[in-house]
Amino acid sequence: MDQSFTKNQPKWQERQPLPEPDNIRVMTSPSLPPEDPLEEIVAPFSAAAPRRLGAMCVFCGANAGSDPAFREAATSLGGALAAHGATLVTGGGSTGLMGAVNDGALAGGGKVIGVIPDFLKSKELADLRSTELLVVPDMHTRKRTMFERADAFCILPGGVGTLDETFEIVTWRQLHLHNKPIILFNVKDYWTPLLAMFDRMRDMNFAHHGHEALVTVVHSAAEAILAAERELAEPKPVVRFPGMKGT
């Protein structure tokens, strides 16, 4: 090894961790308690939906996408939630559409709860402006915490992570483990191919007729909130698929 190189390197000193701001809470408990993991997962999903929209979880991309309409829709949704008096629940990042929906909510004086895994704090640049920022140990805890904090869900354009979050809550609803509204915000027809894929699943007998009742498609922020409120006030009938208990 080149001694002249190592000789000139700075001596790193151990840094003491800085105290977290008051709005940041680090959650260290594991997502799956070893004594009874299945019960711990299912229990939160079994609760009955509330009758008013107190908080909406928004799934969206940590990137802004190629069309300015995506960011505009995200900002509009955040502002509409603030005006409605509903709390915004997000993945806790400050970039892309996640940051834009936070911008809209905070500019309107709304409350924002961010939930971010510790290992993503630097990659997604945790939004320290959040009213409450929950730092959780892993992705499973993130999704579960977001679910527990929300009365309804709205999905904006996003990538693989957004699809992961979306399919999980749709699957749980199909299995009758929750009946919270799931709103698909179809900005610039972004989700139209996904909706076509749902239909293809049905046509190829991989999904049952009635699967379309699991989600509600909207095209504006105002429509998203109205759809969530309407469904919370008058929940959709639980879709009974063949082969499931109660059919």
PLM features: what roles do these ranges have?
Residues F5, L18, M27-S29:
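Polybasic, lysine-enriched low-complexity intrinsically disordered terminal tails
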Residues T141-H176, I183, E234-F241:
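Active-site/ligand-binding-proximal alpha/beta "capping" segment
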Residues D2, N8, D22-N23:
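Intrinsic-disorder-associated, low-complexity terminal segments enriched in Asp/Asn/His/Tyr and depleted
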Residues L106, W172-K180, F206-H208:
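Arginine/glycine-rich "motif VI" loop of SF2 helicases in the C-terminal RecA-like domain
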Residues D22-R149, V187-T247:
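A cross-family phosphate/adenosyl-ligand binding-site feature
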Residues D2-S4, E14-R15, I169:
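Intrinsic, low-complexity polybasic segments
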Residues L156-P157, P181-F185, E212-V215:
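Flexible, glycine/proline-enriched loop segments at strand-loop-helix junctions
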Residues Q13-P17, D22-N23:
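Short, positively charged and aromatic/hydrophobic N-terminal segments
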